[in-house]
Structures are given as structure tokens and as C-alpha cells.
């Protein structure tokens, strides 16, 4: 997922995406703890995607506040 795709989404869609990423991150950490995770890089990818979503949510909130 890239930032361009995220900028096109609404804040509600971004919050939903963030919730999904948090669930995914939790499941990946659980799999790693039990030794079932084949690709540990997935944890890093999920964490960074969540950070991207949070950043864009904050940017949208700041621009909405500035325009008011």
C-alpha cells in the first residue's frame, strides 16, 4: 500500500484500515511467538503501513483544522 492510495481514502476508511492493520500486526506477532511465522518481514511491513495511515490521518486532521 502506498501513500498515494491512502490520500484518496476518507478518514473513516483510513481508521478502518488502521484497525485492520493493528489486527494483522497482532496476529503476526502471535505467529512469531509460536514459531509459525515464515516471513518475519511481514511484521515490519504491517507496522510501517500503520504508521503511514496514522500520518495521513494526522495530515488530514491538520488541514481540516487549518481550513476552518
Curated annotation (Swiss-Prot):
GO terms for cellular component: cytosolic large ribosomal subunit. GO terms for molecular function: structural constituent of ribosome. Belongs to the universal ribosomal protein uL29 family. GO terms for biological process: translation. The lineage of its organism: Bacteria, Pseudomonadati, Pseudomonadota, Alphaproteobacteria, Rhodobacterales. It comes from Roseobacter denitrificans (strain ATCC 33942 / OCh 114) (Erythrobacter sp. (strain OCh 114)). It holds the Pfam family Ribosomal_L29. It comes from the Bacteria. SUPFAM superfamilies: Ribosomal protein L29 (L29p). Keywords: Ribonucleoprotein, Ribosomal protein. This is Large ribosomal subunit protein uL29. The keyword DNA repair does not apply.
Amino acid at each position: 500500500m502506498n501513500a498515494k492510495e491512502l490520500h484518496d481514502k476518507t478518514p473513516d476508511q483510513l481508521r478502518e484500515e488502521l484497525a485492520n492493520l493493528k489486527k494483522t500486526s497482532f496476529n503476526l506477532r502471535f505467529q512469531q511467538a509460536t514459531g509459525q511465522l515464515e516471513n518475519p518481514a511481514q511484521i515490519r511491513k504491517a507496522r510501517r503501513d500503520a504508521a503511514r495511515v496514522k500520518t495521513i490521518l494526522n495530515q488530514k486532521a491538520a488541514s481540516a483544522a487549518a481550513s476552518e
